[in-house]
């Protein structure tokens, strides 16, 4: 009996040894590799890279080589630095490489094994800038042109940012008075609740800067109730500009949207870092129909590529708010074919519990007809998937209504107050108006007058539609008061 026990112990020890042995790539029969291919790992790492502010300020560039162990289940563990650059960048390289967990494990003797993998993480050089006491410092001449020589500057701007470059305080502009800098203007850092709610249903916040007419300018960050970054977008004069990043709850990038002259290109990933999709969207132009989105490639979460060069079948799974309770989410599955990058033929979608479904016919990405079955069994037919709420008669009719009904308050005329009053309101499913309020006003009775006119629009709006069903839509309207 003692002999059998000893054999059993040795077998267990050998099994444990086999499971903990870590192999080099050349020792494997087939080496570990990233799902989707190595080029997409590099794309993922660069999308997630947050160059530390100290390195950014110095403008330095370099390379960190990190090593980890690919486990039999495809996870990456025990990530460490092999070739160092500088401590802050070394830590960042470890962080982002640890986020990628979509590996095909190595195999030896027909079994998955633990295997070492190495990968370089590149930090690109960047224009240096002055960073002091937690703020980015810039100098300008009398014509507001950026200059490097502070002794010739008329203005100094301080932009407080944290170690990741996220806004952390008011932007302050100083003007020189002899040898003394005195505060000239200040742009407060705005932190306010977002009207949107994520899958968690918890409050989200917007952090950024707004100008005098409530337009966002610079970096706008959306965070959750614990401060984790959910989205970051750059704005210029209230319009999105440059690159936008959206994050998964685990901190990895879920979408990266890059801006080009005539389009946006969006690359998306699964939570484990596996690439999901590459698509382009045309920029909207006034009075010109926007062409449908163009999908170049799509992968399943297993790494299998389903759409290649714009052709193939895609199956999308997402979480969407329940119509009956927007704080709760349900799985939504959509599937269909792509040809030349556009939806083609029959596309279908359904809730996981079967309470809602749709079927649509596409030609070159344009919906020709669709039908949606509601939870109560009713069927809605439509030709446009999504239709915005609109004033009956269009924008010309809206302009005429404002011109005919808006009155310039006497107090505002006497004070020679003029400008735009920004009103926000909700257009209900029956076209009625609710929750009208002033976002930014000019005072002297103009704000109240703008509200009065908006509330007088009852019955003059067509509601927004989603697959034939009326939906509530939030609408922002600027109303101009100008003295002749």
Regions found by a protein language model. Give the residues of each.
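Short, solvent-exposed beta-strand/turn "edge" segments of beta-rich domains on protein surfaces
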Residues: 55-59, 414-415
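Glycine/tyrosine- and acidic-biased, solvent-exposed loop/turn segments at the edges of beta-strands
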Residues: 19-23, 39-42, 47-50, 87-88, ...
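Mid-chain, structured segments of secreted extracytoplasmic proteins
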Residues: 67-95
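Extracytoplasmic
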Residues: 61-65, 76, 114-118, 418-422, ...
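Positively charged n-region of N-terminal signal peptides that target proteins for export
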Residues: 1-4
């Amino acid at each position: 009996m003692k002999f059998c026990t000893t054999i059993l112990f040795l077998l267990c020890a050998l099994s444990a040894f086999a499971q903990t042995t870590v192999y080099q790539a050349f020792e494997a029969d087939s080496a570990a590799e990233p799902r989707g291919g190595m080029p997409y790992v590099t794309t993922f790492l660069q999308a997630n890279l947050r160059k530390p502010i100290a390195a950014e300020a110095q403008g330095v560039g370099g390379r960190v080589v990190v090593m980890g162990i690919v486990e039999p289940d495809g996870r990456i563990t025990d990530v460490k630095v092999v070739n160092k650059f500088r401590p802050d960048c070394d830590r960042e390289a470890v962080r982002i490489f640890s986020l990628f967990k979509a590996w095909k494990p190595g195999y030896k003797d027909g079994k998955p094994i633990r295997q070492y993998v190495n990968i370089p993480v590149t930090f690109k050089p960047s224009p240096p800038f002055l960073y002091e006491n937690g703020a980015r410092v810039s100098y300008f001449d009398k014509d507001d042109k950026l200059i490097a020589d502070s002794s010739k500057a008329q203005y100094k701007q301080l932009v407080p940012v944290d170690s990741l470059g996220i806004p952390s305080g008011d932007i302050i502009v100083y003007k020189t008075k002899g040898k003394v800098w005195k505060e000239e203007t200040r742009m407060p850092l705005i932190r306010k609740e977002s009207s949107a709610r994520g899958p968690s249903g918890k409050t989200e916040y917007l952090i950024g800067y707004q100008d005098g007419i409530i337009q966002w300018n610079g970096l706008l960050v959306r965070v959750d109730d614990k401060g984790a970054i959910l989205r970051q977008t750059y704005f210029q004069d209230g319009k999105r500009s440059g690159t936008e990043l959206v994050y998964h709850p685990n901190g990895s990038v879920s979408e990266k949207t890059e801006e080009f002259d005539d389009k946006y290109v969006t690359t998306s990933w699964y939570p484990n870092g596996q690439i999901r999709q590459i698509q382009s969207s045309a920029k909207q132009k006034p009075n010109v129909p926007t062409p449908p989105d163009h999908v170049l490639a799509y992968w399943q979460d297993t790494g299998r590529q389903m759409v290649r060069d714009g052709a193939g079948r895609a199956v999308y799974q997402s979480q969407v708010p329940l119509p009956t309770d927007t704080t709760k989410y349900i799985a939504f599955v959509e599937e269909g074919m792509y040809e030349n990058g556009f939806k083609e033929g029959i596309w279908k979608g359904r809730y996981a519990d079967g309470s809602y479904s749709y079927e649509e016919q596409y030609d070159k990405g344009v919906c020709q007809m669709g039908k949606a079955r509601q939870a109560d069994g009713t069927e809605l037919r439509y030709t446009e998937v999504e239709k915005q709420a609109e004033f009956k008669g269009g924008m010309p009719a809206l302009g005429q209504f404002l011109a005919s009904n808006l009155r310039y308050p006497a107090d505002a005329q006497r004070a020679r107050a003029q400008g735009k009053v920004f009103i926000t309101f909700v257009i209900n499913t029956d076209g009625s108006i609710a929750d009208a309020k002033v976002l930014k006003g000019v005072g002297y009775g103009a704000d109240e007058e703008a509200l009065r006119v908006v509330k007088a629009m009852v019955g003059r709006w067509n509601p927004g539609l989603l697959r034939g069903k009326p939906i509530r839509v939030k609408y922002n309207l600027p109303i101009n008061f100008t003295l002749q």
